């Protein structure tokens, strides 16, 4: 497998295997990793992960597990056995849930995926949190959940780039994965707390998840190359 040389993760947000692989075939695994989310995984199951790995890609399995500790830990174990590079769980599942996942991965003798916690979804603003009983700013909730994640031994966090600087300051050992990345001139779509790729790295993000600006471009390879050039 070719080691990726950039922090870019391209989101394969498609409903079918054929559509996802059509995009993957236009991308260079040395220039990006790929993310498999709920829609594609539900459609294709584990087979899509194996196919992408065979093409040389490191795979971020973005299923955001959230259940009782044992159930979530077993799901993370199954993801590791697929050979994924990164897997995530919701920090709001609590300390015991995250710690159970860490413990399960630490039992493995082979390669371990990065275990990443999801803090506050980048589509959520203060009024969204208020609707679920949290009358606080998203950034405050992110910091609360980050402290739990570090205590549980997580490798990193999914967070908005707008929270990255504060998180790196408070938790420098955690790797930060940032969705909602939009190259200059791109539409915001349904993401709200967003920055450009360069702004996100400068803020402290370690990995950048980019979807539609690459996946819906007329020339995805050219769009990817443009982002790589922006980061050079």
UniProtKB/Swiss-Prot annotation:
<comment type="similarity">
    <text>Belongs to the OMP decarboxylase family. Type 1 subfamily.</text>
</comment>
<keyword id="KW-0665">Pyrimidine biosynthesis</keyword>
<dbReference type="GO" id="GO:0044205">
    <property type="term" value="P:'de novo' UMP biosynthetic process"/>
</dbReference>
<dbReference type="Pfam" id="PF00215">
    <property type="entry name" value="OMPdecase"/>
</dbReference>
<dbReference type="GO" id="GO:0004590">
    <property type="term" value="F:orotidine-5'-phosphate decarboxylase activity"/>
</dbReference>
<dbReference type="InterPro" id="IPR013785">
    <property type="entry name" value="Aldolase_TIM"/>
</dbReference>
<feature type="active site" description="Proton donor">
    <location>
        <position position="64"/>
    </location>
</feature>
<dbReference type="InterPro" id="IPR014732">
    <property type="entry name" value="OMPdecase"/>
</dbReference>
<comment type="function">
    <text>Catalyzes the decarboxylation of orotidine 5'-monophosphate (OMP) to uridine 5'-monophosphate (UMP).</text>
</comment>
<feature type="binding site">
    <location>
        <position position="212"/>
    </location>
    <ligand>
        <name>substrate</name>
    </ligand>
</feature>
<dbReference type="InterPro" id="IPR011060">
    <property type="entry name" value="RibuloseP-bd_barrel"/>
</dbReference>
<feature type="binding site">
    <location>
        <begin position="62"/>
        <end position="71"/>
    </location>
    <ligand>
        <name>substrate</name>
    </ligand>
</feature>
<dbReference type="InterPro" id="IPR047596">
    <property type="entry name" value="OMPdecase_bac"/>
</dbReference>
<dbReference type="InterPro" id="IPR001754">
    <property type="entry name" value="OMPdeCOase_dom"/>
</dbReference>
<keyword id="KW-0456">Lyase</keyword>
<feature type="binding site">
    <location>
        <position position="211"/>
    </location>
    <ligand>
        <name>substrate</name>
    </ligand>
</feature>
<feature type="binding site">
    <location>
        <position position="35"/>
    </location>
    <ligand>
        <name>substrate</name>
    </ligand>
</feature>
<feature type="binding site">
    <location>
        <position position="182"/>
    </location>
    <ligand>
        <name>substrate</name>
    </ligand>
</feature>
<dbReference type="GO" id="GO:0005829">
    <property type="term" value="C:cytosol"/>
</dbReference>
<protein>
    <recommendedName>
        <fullName>Orotidine 5'-phosphate decarboxylase</fullName>
        <ecNumber>4.1.1.23</ecNumber>
    </recommendedName>
</protein>
<keyword id="KW-0210">Decarboxylase</keyword>
<comment type="pathway">
    <text>Pyrimidine metabolism; UMP biosynthesis via de novo pathway; UMP from orotate: step 2/2.</text>
</comment>
<feature type="binding site">
    <location>
        <position position="122"/>
    </location>
    <ligand>
        <name>substrate</name>
    </ligand>
</feature>
<dbReference type="GO" id="GO:0006207">
    <property type="term" value="P:'de novo' pyrimidine nucleobase biosynthetic process"/>
</dbReference>
<feature type="binding site">
    <location>
        <position position="191"/>
    </location>
    <ligand>
        <name>substrate</name>
    </ligand>
</feature>
<comment type="subunit">
    <text>Homodimer.</text>
</comment>
<feature type="binding site">
    <location>
        <position position="13"/>
    </location>
    <ligand>
        <name>substrate</name>
    </ligand>
</feature>
<dbReference type="InterPro" id="IPR018089">
    <property type="entry name" value="OMPdecase_AS"/>
</dbReference>
């Amino acid at each position: 497998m070719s080691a990726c040389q950039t922090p870019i993760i391209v989101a394969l947000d498609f409903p079918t295997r054929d559509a996802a692989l059509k995009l993957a075939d236009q991308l260079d695994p040395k220039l990006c990793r790929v993310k498999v989310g709920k829609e594609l995984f539900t459609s294709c199951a584990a087979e899509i992960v194996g196919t992408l790995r065979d093409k040389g890609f490191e795979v971020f399995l973005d299923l955001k597990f959230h259940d009782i500790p044992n159930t979530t830990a077993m799901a993370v174990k199954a993801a590791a056995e697929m050979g994924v590079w990164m897997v995530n769980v919701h920090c709001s599942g609590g300390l015991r849930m995250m710690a159970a996942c860490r413990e399960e991965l630490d039992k493995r003798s082979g390669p371990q995926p990065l275990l990443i916690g999801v803090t506050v979804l980048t589509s959520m603003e203060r009024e969204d949190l208020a609707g679920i009983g949290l009358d606080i700013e998203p950034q405050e909730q992110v910091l609360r959940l980050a402290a739990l994640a570090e205590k549980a031994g997580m490798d990193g966090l999914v967070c908005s780039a707008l929270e990255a600087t504060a998180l790196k300051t408070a938790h420098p050992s955690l790797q930060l994965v940032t969705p909602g990345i939009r190259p200059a001139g791109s539409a915001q779509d349904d993401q709200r707390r967003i920055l450009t790729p360069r702004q996100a790295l400068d803020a402290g993000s370690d990995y950048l998840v980019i979807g539609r600006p690459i996946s819906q471009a007329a020339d995805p390879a050219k769009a990817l190359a443009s982002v790589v050039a922006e980061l050079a």
